[in-house]
Regions:
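Short beta-strand scaffold positions
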Residues: 1, 80-81
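Conserved active-site segments centered on acidic
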Residues: 1-74, 144-153, 157
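Phosphate-binding/catalytic loops
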Residues: 77, 83-158
Length: 158
C-alpha cells in the first residue's frame, strides 16, 4: 500500500487489509510506504489512528517509511492510492518497476475507473472517515477476489 507520505491513507490500507487477512486465516505480509520521505519514522496521523481504532484496528505501531525499488521485488502486489503516486513509484524504482504488480487500490472495486483515494491530509476528520470507507470496501474486494481464485485453484497459497 503506497501513498505520498505514509501517514494517512496507506497506513489505513495496511491496517485494514492485514486485519481482514487475519480474520480470513490468511498469512499475508501487508506493508505500506510513501513516495516521499518527509515523515520517515513517524506514526500514522492521529486522525487515521482514531478512525482505524473506531473500527477495532490499531495502527499506532506503524512507522512511516519511504517506498524503494526493493519493494517492487519483495511484494507480489502493490496498491497505490493515486495516479501521481504510481508515477513517483515508477521514477523511484526505474528498471525495477513492474507494472504487472502495481495498480490503483480502487481498481479492485471499480475496475478500470482509475479512481484515486483522496488525501485527507490537512482536512477535517470526516475526510478520514470517507477514506476509511473507500479503503474498507476496496480491501473487501481484494479478500473476496482472493477467496474466489483460491476456490477455483486450491494450489494457491494462503
Amino acid at each position: 500500500m503506497v501513498c505520498l507520505g505514509n501517514i494517512c491513507r496507506s497506513p489505513l490500507a495496511e491496517g485494514i487489509l492485514q486485519h481482514k487477512a487475519q480474520q480470513a486465516g490468511l498469512s499475508w505480509s501487508v506493508d505500506s510506504a510513501g513516495t516521499n520521505g518527509y515523515h520517515t519514522g513517524d506514526a500514522p496521523h492521529r486522525l487515521s489512528q482514531k478512525v482505524a481504532l473506531l473500527h477495532g484496528i490499531d495502527i499506532s505501531h506503524q512507522c512511516a517509511r519511504r517506498f524503494t525499488a526493493a519493494d517492487c521485488k519483495q511484494f507480489d502486489k502493490i496498491y497505490a492510492m493515486a495516479e501521481d503516486v504510481i508515477d513517483e513509484m515508477r521514477r523511484i524504482a526505474r528498471k525495477d518497476f513492474d507494472a504487472t504488480k502495481v495498480d490503483l487500490l480502487m481498481n479492485e472495486l471499480y475496475p478500470g475507473k482509475n479512481m484515486d483515494v483522496p488525501d485527507p491530509w490537512y482536512g477535517p476528520e470526516p475526510g478520514y472517515h470517507k477514506v476509511f470507507k473507500m479503503i474498507d470496501e476496496a480491501t473487501d474486494a481484494i479478500i473476496n477476489k482472493y477467496a474466489s481464485e483460491k476456490s477455483r485453484n486450491p494450489e494457491i497459497k494462503k
